[in-house]
């Protein structure tokens, strides 16, 4: 009888332990459940679109400059992170900074120009595909996308169906768009990609919450460096184009490090008259040194200016002088931490 009770008690303990593990490591939780100062060296995600399409400077990069970017990364002894490893190891603090390469929209210029170079040098990347334009003029077709998928280092990501301004649409339209894209991915690839990129980097709380229940990771288009405490479904990337891909700037970007924080408010990134300007608050970890040196800049009133910040016991608040104007409001904060520049950005969509 005593032995049976001991065995029953032991089984209960094991079941409880398994339950706790499942709760702790649920990869589809909207945000990491446990926040701690990790001293993570970070993952720097960079985003490209077109290659050698000089008619579109806001989304284009020349191949010559792109190759120099890769050389700068390698010369800095930084390694490209395979997307699958990035997902599987997200909750592990990085002892060395890594680079995650992402490409949005599956333009034909990527396949014609960048893909042969990446294939030759076996550089891993994510290609985010919107299903509606596939096969149209200027876009890759499904056979070309499958060629990327068959490689050992190319991963296909989800970028909606229409690539529309979905944040402007009804919740029903957003859901229908994602579900239609899912059907097409299943038909063409046999599965639905688990990495997601919000079209134009825009999302509301509703969109983010839905994506968090159906994908493993999601990216915006706001700058910053990823660490284990960042929300898995609001991950930052540095957008690179002809203007913002200039070599001097790129050298600075790859030398940035994450600025970790416990909490950032507001969670809702879609602003209206009722909540614009937002009540912005960030709580940093007690272990973060030199946070008193932080500076923030914001484009409130459509004018970039130094923010009026208040820092009390590791909690930062910003007093905005004016509301943000459509379409995007941004706040960039950085701190010199004993020679390491730490950076994060928050983006709001203004309606």
Regions flagged by a language model, labelled:
Residues 224-228:
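A ligand-binding cleft/hinge motif common to bilobed small-molecule-binding domains
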Residues 41-60, 76, 89-99, 108-113, ...:
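Metal-dependent polysaccharide deacetylase catalytic core of the NodB/CE4 family, i.e.
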Residues 176-178, 206-219:
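Short, electropositive alpha-helical surface patch
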Residues 79, 155, 216-217:
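Conserved beta-strand segments of alpha/beta enzyme cores
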Residues 1-96, 116-143, 239-351:
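Terminal accessory/targeting
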Residues 188-191, 213-223:
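Catalytic-core region of carbohydrate-active enzymes that cleave or remodel glycosidic bonds
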